Amino acid sequence: MLRLFIVGFLTSLVLWAAPAGPPPVPREFRAMWIATVGNIDWPSKSGLPVARQQAELRALLDTAQRWHLNAVILQVRTSCDALYASPLEPWSEYLSGRMGVAPLPAWDPLAFAVTEAHARSLELHAWLNPFRARYSQAISPVAAQHVSRTRPDLVVQYGKFLWLDPGLAESRDHTLKVVADLVHRYDIDGIHIDDYFYPYPEKTSLGTPVPFPDERSWSAYQRSGGKLSRPDWRRENVNTLVRAMNTAVHREKPWVKFGISPFGIWRPGFPEGIKGLDQHEVLYADARKWIREGMADYFAPQLYWTERQTEQRFSRLLAWWASENVSHRHLWPGINTADIGKNRTASEIVWQTDQIGPETHSSGVIHWNASALQENRDGVGTRLIQGPFAHRALVPASPWLGSQPPETPAIEVGYGGKGPITIDLNAGKGRLSAVVVQTHGEWAWKTEIYPGNTRRIPVPRTYRGTPPKEVRVTTLSSPGIESAPAIWRPK
């Protein structure tokens, strides 16, 4: 039996009035985005010593754990670069300060982040931008191995940005190779893309929109006999990528989730009275089609507005997205926690978080961004764990990714010494996402959530002076399906 003793990074301690059986553990996705482009969240600036970069990343993960989150979404590809050891794209300038230069001493930030996140019972989702090839505020010279140098035929300039042309199959294939490599080599829990598909429009000095320069790929499509209008063709280019990403992720590892975080308004007038940017016509993102057809495992529309903004009201937009989710995938909206102190208070963020639940047909929330939570702006983290995040939660199950529960764990109990009782766990075969231990004392159940690779569990000999009456241990599969419990009752 494998005996790996993990006491550190114990993830939850929840007290409940003792019912006849243990209470169900809450299921809710609670995450934050960790943005690396422009050093928004991490690292705090480029060129830092590796030890400092690692310490900053650990501190962000500690923040997620402190505020009872269960996932982080780490940006690992900002613009056809890599914040990990990639055989396909150059190192990001946001690490070393120069694109293509590996960190010294050598380390792999994504592998490090996965290990550290999982030790804290946090899922790690790798976030990438599928088409952006060069950020407008990038400073470093372009590395020789960057796609704009190796395949300039795939890249167009638009304003101060470079973009892979979505109309070229080879552009999409390049991104798909990156996705497949990420899922294959790293023990990540999700692949995540945001709202950047075709770019947000650039404007001239007179304020008129600048056309996106895809004439070459559009002409090739027409010569091939294509019949779609140019807007429909652009939307289908994005649809093709989304479908292919979903397939690529699940082909490599069926349990890894694929998520999309589109702009929060599909089209003006949906629902009635809503105004704002038309992503369907401007970004060529048909997000309603994606959520209706279940083309991803979770959707996180960026609902960055307040309840006071009647033309973009949070509650109305949340209800609309929920009504479109006919494929019953996860709906985990993003909210603008970074706006605290500008246009909203922490109380509003807590209120928005509190709207998530069965009544709104949503089961999670993602906070933009990590820095706001780390700074505990206006006490937002404190208020969350005193309110909607008071109890720790498991990530909701994704049964369409695998509905088979793990086998009931086998346990062995040890009483050696004067320390805690130990329960050794034989969890059988397969990757596990969590181990749940529920202990019944005299008046309450205690629920603890451990990392999925935990194989030895300490159980106090007494809790508030009372020996445990019953201990139940369950395991969760990677898609979040819970096993039957192993039960120990002291004699």
What are these regions (language model features)?
Residues 461-483:
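Beta-strand-rich modules
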Residues 170, 174-178, 184-185, 189-193, ...:
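Active-site neighborhood of glycoside hydrolase catalytic domains
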Residues 27, 35-55, 126, 131-185, ...:
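Active-site-adjacent "subsite" loops/lids of carbohydrate-active enzymes
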Residues 82-97, 132-158, 195-224, 270-278:
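Aromatic- and acidic-residue-enriched segments that line the glycan-binding/catalytic groove
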Residues 55-81, 185-189, 295-296:
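Catalytic domains of carbohydrate-active enzymes, especially glycoside hydrolases
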Residues 67-105:
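Aromatic-lined carbohydrate-binding/catalytic grooves of carbohydrate-active enzymes
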Residues 284-288, 292-310, 321-400:
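Substrate-binding cleft of secreted/luminal carbohydrate-active enzymes
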Residues 419-430:
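Conserved aromatic anchor
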